[in-house]
Design a protein with these regions (language model features):
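Extended, H/D-rich, highly charged conserved domains that either
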Residues: 125-197, 218-219, 232, 268-312
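Beta-strand-rich interaction surfaces with strong enrichment in secreted/lumenal proteins
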Residues: 580-583, 649-655
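Short, well-ordered beta-strand segments enriched in hydrophobic/aromatic residues
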Residues: 209, 549, 590-598, 662-667
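CE4/NodB-like, metal-dependent polysaccharide N-deacetylase domain
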Residues: 230-268, 356-374
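Short, solvent-exposed turn/loop segments enriched in Gly/Ser/Thr/Pro and often Arg
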Residues: 56-61, 210-213, 265-274, 410-414
């Protein structure tokens, strides 16, 4: 009987945060994800022995975890969390406050009452330049919770110390702090053995990525970016295929030393591939590689149906040969970006329903289907309820009980289906089948130019030999990593962008220092330009726009509040930003809302649904509108008003119209909102029962409605 074979590949990666000269870890995220994800993601599979999966381990991440496990890692963030609260200097207090709330508020801060209480107190006391008045006990509790919130569900439920800290919640002691530091080292020490255990049993396969996570096609030849994006502005040519080979060879050696055998498989950093990369990988002994369905589409020159996607391929050129699978971009991104907003069971049901539907025709024809699900194995879970563990248990349990569905490793899957031949692979990544995230923008190109200068300096500094030369070359390999240019350019944002910029320039400066040369002055200046975050402008007066879906006149929305979303993603990429701008305001009797959409998505709106929730800011029930979009406009599909409004004269409590923009009117009395009262609201866009965008991404937008009496004053 034909089967559906699911190939899950979880990519585990963090940038190389260690400065090789100072020995310090400049950011704590490898340690934090070791607590929250690296162990728990593989440990959960022991509950589901039928589920076989592939884990893609980046050696530079594993090396950092090993340093934390040995106690050799020097981490100022951990040191600050362990310092006695009574002894904190003013500088350390500011450091603790700045870095203790880098967590998702909904799922990682407010989940724990004391952490949420401290977060609210920090926000309330944080006017520009103001000093936050926390007691020593407040600081100690914050030091503990900034770490505890990152402990995996496994430890929160089964480890006696961690479970007791979570239960107690407050009034932690210095002994608790010290034990918490020891516990982190213990957990880091459990990561590698857990992978070794399940790899030895055959339940998981270990694949890898080039050692410091470079975009291999660009390291081989940066000019190849012009193939996938003609006319993209490019920096001076960087062409060092020998570095690409070295990064891959180091990875194979590292994995072989840890797991007793070299890896068969390769997830090139960010799914970035080219014929030259495949040739090098094949020559080094890799037998398979994975990339994205977008790359397959551009390779064959057209959109590939699921019959073509759900099968393996065999790439051959000259003496080179590699098995290749292409990730289902849509299904993988559902886990990465959409299901976090849904009930765990409903999300698992939706996922498997889509797979059954996609595979029905393939199975009916008598063929097996191989479905590659490939995504980040760490960053998505902080946006899920309880770190995504309820969702994974629902999903794995259902797959285990499906008679025509089997979860396999990639190598297992490649043995089960005959491959389709490929004589060429289009150069691209999993993001839009090009390399635009890492090259082409002004910041990116400046980073590549500085990398090239350092690389050329290394080649010419032949007088330096031995350990210093080796360390200089290692710094070059680190600087070739993809993570630095991930944060340059317009695509992504993080509060840590300045630290990433500083760390990249430090790695390049260290190249010169190890070569006994003074770093060029340009490395002392930030590459980053000024960021443009989300902006919010309060309403300045009453408005009464015509609800026609058109910008009838500049003046009809004059006085409205404006919210412009920050359109950069964080550490995850794949979020669609459909809404460009929100305008809002009121008159004596109505609340008005206008959504302006990005032109690139205007044609995709038909079939979507806008959901608007609004109500009094202080207390009271919220009202809800569901608005369906069609090619001809928009209609209200559902309206739940806080106050009964059946007897309101036409056009009733609410109306809407979609053309160039979406315009919405909602009666203030029907919402239970008095004139002059504060109102809060949020909007989301849905398609096929899945959330696609939300404004704002967290929390509510707020405004005060028009008060005629106040205006007369």
């Amino acid at each position: 009987m034909p089967q559906t074979y699911l190939c899950f590949l979880w990519h585990m990666h963090q940038p190389f945060y260690k400065d090789l000269i100072s020995g310090e870890y400049k950011l704590p995220w490898t340690r934090m994800h070791a607590l929250k994800d690296y162990y728990g993601m593989v440990r959960i599979l022991e509950e589901f022995p039928k589920i076989h999966q592939t884990f893609n381990l980046v050696p530079s991440m594993m090396a950092q975890v090993a340093e934390y496990a040995s106690g050799a890692a020097v981490d100022p963030y951990l040191q600050a969390a362990l310092e006695p609260a009574e002894n904190l200097s003013e500088e350390t207090r500011r450091f603790v406050l700045r870095h203790s709330f880098y967590s998702d508020p909904q799922h990682m801060i407010y989940r724990y009452p004391r952490y949420g209480e401290l977060f609210d107190a920090w926000k309330a006391q944080k006017p520009a330049g103001g000093r936050v008045m926390f007691s020593a006990q407040d600081f100690r509790d914050l030091q503990m919770w900034s770490q505890l919130a990152w402990f995996d569900e496994e430890f929160q439920q089964t480890d006696p110390d961690v479970a007791e800290w979570v239960r107690r919640g407050r009034n932690f002691t210095l002994a608790d702090q010290r034990r918490m530091g020891e516990k982190q080292r213990e957990i880091a020490g459990q990561v590698q053995p857990e992978y070794q255990k399940l790899a030895a049993s055959g339940q998981i396969e270990i694949s890898t990525t080039p050692f410091y996570h470079p975009i291999l096609p660009l390291v081989c030849d940066s000019q190849i970016a012009g193939v996938s994006h003609p006319n993209v502005p490019l920096p001076p040519r960087f062409r060092y295929p020998q570095d690409a080979r070295r990064q891959l060879a180091m990875s194979r050696e590292y994995i072989a030393n840890v797991f007793g055998a070299p890896p068969a498989g390769l997830w090139p950093s960010e799914g970035s591939v080219s014929d030259e990369v495949f040739s090098i990988a094949s020559d080094l002994g890799f037998s398979w590689a994975a990339t994205d369905s977008g790359v397959l589409n551009r390779t064959v020159g057209h959109g590939v149906p699921v019959e073509g996607l759900y099968r393996p391929y065999q790439w051959r050129q000259g003496k080179g040969s590699l098995g290749v699978i292409f990730r289902d971009h849509f299904l993988s991104d559902l886990i990465g970006f959409v299901y976090s907003k849904m009930d765990a069971a409903a999300a698992a049901d939706d996922f498997l329903h889509r797979i059954r539907d996609n595979c029905s025709g393939i199975l009916a024809s008598g063929r097996d289907a191989l479905v590659p699900i490939i995504l980040d194995g760490e960053n998505a879970w902080e946006y899920y309820h309880r770190n995504g563990r309820p969702f994974l248990r629902e999903l794995y349990g259902r797959i285990s009980n499906e008679p025509r569905m089997t979860a396999v490793t990639v190598s297992e899957g490649l043995k089960l289906l005959a491959p389709e031949p490929l004589d060429h692979i289009f150069p691209g990544s999993w993001i839009n089948a090009n390399f635009d995230v890492w090259i082409g923008a002004e910041e990116d190109n400046q980073a590549w130019t500085q990398l090239l200068r350092a690389r050329e300096t290394f080649d010419s500094a032949t007088a330096v030999t031995g350990d210093k030369r080796n360390l200089a070359f290692e710094e070059l390999l680190i600087a070739e990593g993809s993570d630095w240019c991930w944060w340059y350019g317009p695509e992504h944002d993080s509060e840590n962008r300045p630290e990433f910029d500083q760390l990249y320039r430090s790695h390049l400066a260290n190249v010169y220092r190890f070569l006994n040369l003074a770093p060029p002055e340009e490395l002392s200046r930030p590459i980053l330009r000024v960021a443009l975050p989300a902006t919010m402008i309060e309403p300045t007066g009453p408005i009464t726009p015509v609800i026609d879906g058109e910008v009838t006149s500049y003046f009809e929305w004059l006085g409205a509040g404006v919210y412009r979303a920050d359109e950069r993603a964080g550490s995850m990429h794949g979020k669609k930003f459909l809404v460009k701008e929100v305008q809002f305001g009121s008159d004596d009797v109505n609340f008005y809302l206008r959504l302006d959409f990005h032109a690139a998505y205007q044609q995709e709106l038909a079939g979507m649904e806008a959901r608007i929730t609004a109500g009094p800011r202080e207390n009271g029930e919220t009202s809800y509108l569901a608005i369906g979009f069609t090619h001809g406009g928009a209609t209200i599909k559902e309206a739940r008003m806080a106050v009964a409004s059946e007897n309101m004269p036409p056009p009733g409590p609410a109306e809407c119209m979609l053309s160039r923009v979406l315009e919405v009117r909602v009666s203030l009395p029907a919402m239970g909102v008095r004139r002059g009262q504060g109102i809060r609201f949020q909007c989301s866009l849905w398609q096929g029962g899945l959330p696609m965008d939300a404004v704002p991404q967290q929390g509510w937008l707020e405004m005060r409605t028009t008060d005629p009496a106040r205006m007369e004053e």
